[in-house]
Amino acid sequence: MTRSVKRVVLVLLAAAVLAFAAWMLWPRSLGGAFAFDQPFTLTVTELEMQEDGSWTVKEPVSSVLEQGTPAAETVREALEGYSYHLCLSSLAGDRLVPIGEQSVFLDSVSDGKKDHLGLIAGSNRLGCGDRVVQGYFRDSTVLCEQLSAILRGESGVAN
């Protein structure tokens, strides 16, 4: 009787661990991670490395995109092509992502609720809401470039 109880407990524990791992690694769409039902700000910040190893921040480029506009839909479609999953940093409450030469941020506020998505070129870690998650991609450089091109087209900034 005691052996069968131990076996059942071990099987239940193993099932719980597998369910937890599946939940953590389950792919979630980046397009679904951000609320596109309201205007949002798309900001691109670029850093330039100096000879002494320090970083200089170039002037950020930012634009407010209205819901349903072609630019907002293009941003949503670009994000739909990428997935992310939770990681240990998500559970630990870590909010820091590595620094990169280019950063892209989407921010909106509706009914007092802030929505945020932050991508750093060269990293597969991103800020999603109030936590750090890991993308199912090697790094977000291509996505950052896509979103930067959308912003340049929307704001008329030549690059």
Predicted regions and their residues:
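Function-determining sites in protein domains
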Residues: 2-12, 16-159
